[in-house]
Amino acid sequence: MLETPKVLLKNLQDCKIHFIGIGGIGISGLAKYLKAQGAKISGSDIAISPSVKYLKALGVEINIPHDPKAINHQDVIIHSAIIKEDNTEIQRAKELEIPILSRKDALYSILKDKRVFSVCGAHGKSSITAMLSAICPAFGAIIGAHSKEFDSNVRESADMSLVFEADESDSSFLFSNPFCAIVPNTEPEHLEHYDHDLERFFFAYKYFLDHAQKRVIYKEDPFLKNYSKDAIVLEKKDIYNIQYILKDGEPYTSFELKNLGAFLVWGLGEHNATNASLAILSALDELNLEEIRNNLLNFKGIKKRFDILQKNNLILIDDYAHHPTEIGATLKSARIYANLLNTQEKIIVIWQAHKYSRLMDNLEEFKKCFLEHCDRLIILPVYSASEVKRDIDLKAHFKHYNPTFIDRVRKKGDFLELLVNDNVVETIEKGFVIGFGAGDITYQLRGEM
């Protein structure tokens, strides 16, 4: 199933690497990591993003937008999955016979000599990766989100061990060279990449697990409960005495795990305790138990995952959840947080569906996921993520919520403005608001667009 890429990155010191789509969270992580390894990095993207700004501040030359003139003397080109063959920079690289790698192919070269703790699953992988990197601070880390512990999606380290967030959406997790494969769940997602073939989808997970020396899995998952090879297994009954507290105003979950005693982790919800437990079990051979317990406290959450933007008259939370399962779990956390704050405010959800394909594939579950803990639903237009627009009658499908439909939301000081046709139709000055989506809703809620 896995073919070794024909082009391999060898000596990274002074290797000239150009990234097309450098602003994406996955590509920017590789760019930061390779720069720290001594490579000479350049890149391009269609727009300026926080990742682009960060890399520019490090001295990386970045073209906005893509420009074939940026391709000249590089040793290799690496592009994100979204970049097509007709991209002008790709075409120029072919003319100059510069080797071209997809991010997936580049991973093999970057990780092949590392001791990789590779985390993959439909939900929770960013959190688990960040938690494990907090527990094992000497390890390098490449995460698909910004860890608040070190304010980046990358932590550079000379250590051979690396915590890596792997991606099943394009099967690139198969290239991550897992020493330890950590899988919280295998709920089918991104099936278009697997030709909507569930057998092929689950075979990829089996291949990923089979080729690791060590495996840590959550046995409640329907696929993982039947996995037959040796693995460190977590079951729901292994986590008990779960409690939620505010510590210095921050939300925490305390829990006990197997016979290992009590742990405290930033964030709320049973899923948070599950994620932390998988990270803990993955680290048992690396550190003593007290080090694990203490280091877990360094985890302070990750950007866009139950990201509390403000907590005054208007409590505002930004969350990346874009699948019904994730939204349902995070809404439970929101209710717990509201109860801890002793607020009587109703929970207002602002939702931006991400991709027409995902919305259609999971429509019935989306129609149900707001039933609990959502007191008011506000719906933004679908964020297409470059997909062709499809006609979906959201008003009809979600009429049971009596939702409010808007074009965009705008942060104005400590308030939120709801806009239709560029006209403010409502201002939210107080209450409890949580935004869900993997598109540009995060920038709208932060007043960055």
Curated annotation (Swiss-Prot):
GO terms for biological process: cell division; cell wall organization; peptidoglycan biosynthetic process; regulation of cell shape. ATP binds at residues 121-127. GO terms for molecular function: ATP binding; UDP-N-acetylmuramate-L-alanine ligase activity. It is an enzyme of class 6 (ligase). Its EC number is 6.3.2.8. The keyword Cell cycle applies. Pfam families: Mur_ligase, Mur_ligase_C, Mur_ligase_M. GO terms for cellular component: cytoplasm. Pathway: Cell wall biogenesis; peptidoglycan biosynthesis. It catalyses: UDP-N-acetyl-alpha-D-muramate + L-alanine + ATP = UDP-N-acetyl-alpha-D-muramoyl-L-alanine + ADP + phosphate + H(+). The keyword Cell wall biogenesis/degradation applies. It is found in: Cytoplasm. Keywords: ATP-binding, Cell cycle, Cell division, Cell shape, Cell wall biogenesis/degradation, Cytoplasm, Ligase, Nucleotide-binding, Peptidoglycan synthesis. Its main location: cytoplasm. Belongs to the MurCDEF family. Cell wall formation. This is UDP-N-acetylmuramate--L-alanine ligase. It comes from Helicobacter pylori (strain J99 / ATCC 700824). The lineage of its organism: Bacteria, Pseudomonadati, Campylobacterota, Epsilonproteobacteria, Campylobacterales.
